[in-house]
A protein has these predicted regions:
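Electrostatic cytochrome c docking/interface patches
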Residues: 1-15
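The canonical Cys-X-X-Cys-His
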Residues: 12, 17-27, 79
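Short, non-ligating residues that shape and space the ligands of small metal-coordination modules
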Residues: 29-30, 50
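Extracytoplasmic electron-transfer domains, predominantly the class I c-type cytochrome c fold
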Residues: 36-87
Length: 87
């Protein structure tokens, strides 16, 4: 039986592979970044001190080069769970 956390990570991966992949490397197996200025998810995950709070703030803040992606709170939670699973 799958756990809720595994479901969240799986859903976050699905969102990342659908939306975020337009600019970011979203998995360790992806070699080419569509946008060289968009940090790869594995690099984001491995940033010292990276937490769900820091990722929430980043996703809710406008970035100069990042499109304003609107995620529902549960989608944002799941993308964050996926990113942190890459640690």
């Amino acid at each position: 039986m799958r756990t809720q956390e595994a479901d969240n990570v799986g859903h976050g991966r699905q969102i990342a592979q659908t939306i975020c992949v337009a600019c970011h490397v979203v998995s360790r197996g992806q070699r080419v970044s569509p946008n060289s200025e968009a940090p790869p998810f594995p690099m984001i995950a491995e940033t010292p001190g990276m937490t769900s709070i820091a990722l929430t703030a980043a996703l809710l803040t406008s970035h100069r080069l990042m499109p304003n992606i609107i995620l529902e709170p549960d989608e944002r939670r799941d993308v964050i769970a996926y990113i942190l699973s890459l640690q």
